[in-house]
Amino acid sequence: MSFFSKSIRAVSDIIDEAVRNVRGRISSDVSFSEYVNEIEKEAHRLYLLEEKRVVREILLKEINPESRLKDTLQKVADIVVELSTVIANTRRSRGGMSSEYILSYALKEYGIDNEPVGRRRSKKSYYPDVAIPSKEALEKNPNGVIALAVKRTLRERWREDIPIFRHFPNAAFVCLSDSADITEGKLLDMQEEGLRVLFLPDNLYFSLKGFIEEDIKRIEVYELSYLPRWIRAKLSLLR
């Protein structure tokens, strides 16, 4: 059902609306981490509303109101089965894009020029999710930019982003959602896999701070609210 994926609003449009809604209800002194999480939660809420709207349109389009109840129920069941896979695939593909766009929007709000790259991968190359200051700068001089890999949670395939630290000397892995399933064991796995710089939502970082200081020696781990300052410090060294 290509109609479903084509009918859902673009990720950028949903996040635009989420940002406007969040701006109108949060205080000006909110932390960067909380700001990002508020946008992420609002974007998720809006996306679910989009799903419901499109599913309703499909049902109204496909169901004949004159049909017998038995036939109608069978038709609904067939549509639901088909849609379940389509919805899951659409969520997966758009979820990755939404994370990078949310972070990009938030960084721009903090005065940091950046650009979502649009993930491209092959066996021979790796591209990050967000380039600072731009994709053009990334293409021209990979050593002179900051490259960010972005994940909403760590249930996602974080190992696929380890190459960012081989391709870009100024790189970081950023986890956005404060509902991320980060554990001590996962941090140890990341350390063994070669992850070098990690930003975690503030509440998760501080809940694990003791373990991080004691056992995580080969990863620079920071709270998410520190990211804008970290970027500015890196940029000052690159100029």
Task: Give the ranges of each region predicted by the language model.
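Nuclease-adjacent, charged terminal/linker segments that flank catalytic cores
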Residues: M1-D71
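Intrinsically disordered, low-complexity, charge-dense segments enriched in Lys/Arg
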Residues: S2, D78, R92, A180-L187
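Short acidic loop-to-helix transition motifs that present clustered carboxylates
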Residues: L59-E62, S122-S125, R155, A180-I182
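Short secondary-structure transition/capping segments
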Residues: D78-I79, Y126-I132, G185-K186, G210-F211
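Catalytic centers of nucleases
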Residues: E100-E160
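Catalytic cores of nucleic-acid endonucleases
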Residues: N141-P201
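Domain-level recognition of nuclease-like catalytic cores that cleave nucleotide substrates
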Residues: A180-R239
